[in-house]
């Protein structure tokens, strides 16, 4: 997938799910399933419910995404 095809949105983590998946509510009100990107996983950044995050989504599947940044 090319970098320009990615949709970036901000949201809030609602719940943690098994297999490092998270339920995220986007700013526009939609809820999606998101997994953690490799850079966040390598640096052992903890993501907890209530955290504000940036999510990358593919235009082909708008129900899933990848968490790329956790705001402090």
Swiss-Prot record:
GO CC terms, sorted: cytosol
Subcellular compartments: Cytoplasm
CDD domains: S1_IF1
Domain of life: Bacteria
Alphabetically ordered keywords of this record: Cytoplasm, Initiation factor, Protein biosynthesis, RNA-binding, rRNA-binding
S1-like domain segment(s): 1-72
Matching Pfam families: eIF-1a
Primary localization: cytoplasm
Family of the protein in this entry: Belongs to the IF-1 family.
Cross-referenced HAMAP family: IF_1
Complex formation: Component of the 30S ribosomal translation pre-initiation complex which assembles on the 30S ribosome in the order IF-2 and IF-3, IF-1 and N-formylmethionyl-tRNA(fMet); mRNA recruitment can occur at any time during PIC assembly.
Entry protein name: Translation initiation factor IF-1
Organism of derivation: Staphylococcus aureus (strain NCTC 8325 / PS 47)
């Amino acid at each position: 997938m090319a970098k320009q095809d990615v949709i970036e949105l901000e949201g809030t983590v609602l719940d943690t799910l098994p297999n490092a998946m998270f339920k995220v509510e986007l700013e526009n009100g939609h809820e999606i399933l998101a997994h953690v990107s490799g850079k966040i996983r390598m640096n052992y950044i903890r993501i907890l419910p209530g955290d504000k995050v940036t999510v990358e989504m593919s235009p082909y599947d708008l129900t899933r995404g990848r968490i790329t940044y956790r705001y402090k």
